[in-house]
Amino acid sequence: MDEYKNIEEKMKKTVSVLKDELNTVRAGRANAAILDRITVDYYGVPTPINQLGTISVPEPRVIVIQPWDAQILKEIEKEIQKSDIGINPNNDGKVIRLVFPPLTEERRKELTKLAKKYGEDAKVAIRSIRRDGIEKKKAMKKNGEITEDDLKSAEKDIQNLTDKYIAEIDKLIEIKEKEILEV
């Protein structure tokens, strides 16, 4: 039974990673999570931007970063420019503003493809977890630890878990696509 919990935990973690990845895909409005992967060299330590100051979303298409240490503004600005978010930071000496332009139709399609790719990667990971789980059960049967009926039952249970998490991934991707394509 612990084996099922282990498999389910791995599948949950895969879905959780997918959610984090989807949060970094920009939809029509500003989302502070888009900055989560950007780190800044702060006194020799790579530090996430959200640990260097306050991040707020005062308007639907604007993110404001207000660092606690104003000397780090230039570094934050430089790292945002180097990142792949495609936004030019506006530094006024106190805060950095990120103004998100409305998405073009072409950019929306690119982002939809990216979201689908993240979804496919997650599905591959789920199927890999299923395969590993079933292989372990087959090895147990081969060693005489479980019966043929136990193996069939285990395969069915693992497949049900797989179906559940694949459906959850499909739902997450569908929601993200609607969010991206929403004008």
From Swiss-Prot:
Keyword RNA-binding part of the UniProt annotation: no
Tagged with keyword Flavoprotein: no
Highest taxon of the lineage: Bacteria
One Gene Ontology MF term: ribosomal large subunit binding
SUPFAM superfamilies registered for this protein in UniProt: Ribosome recycling factor, RRF
Keywords: Cytoplasm, Protein biosynthesis
InterPro entries named among the record's database cross-references: Ribosome_recyc_fac, Ribosome_recyc_fac_dom, RRF_sf
UniProt record, GO biological process: translational termination
Gene3D superfamilies: 3.30.1360.40, Ribosome-recycling factor
One GO location term (cellular component): cytoplasm
Predominant cellular place of this UniProt entry's protein: cytoplasm
Entry's localization field: Cytoplasm
Function: Responsible for the release of ribosomes from messenger RNA at the termination of protein biosynthesis. May increase the efficiency of translation by recycling ribosomes from one round of translation to another.
PANTHER family: MITOCHONDRIAL RIBOSOME RECYCLING FACTOR PSEUDO 1, RIBOSOME RECYCLING FACTOR
Family: Belongs to the RRF family.
NCBIfam families: frr
Name listed for the protein in its UniProt record: Ribosome-recycling factor
Taxonomic source organism: Acetivibrio thermocellus (strain ATCC 27405 / DSM 1237 / JCM 9322 / NBRC 103400 / NCIMB 10682 / NRRL B-4536 / VPI 7372)
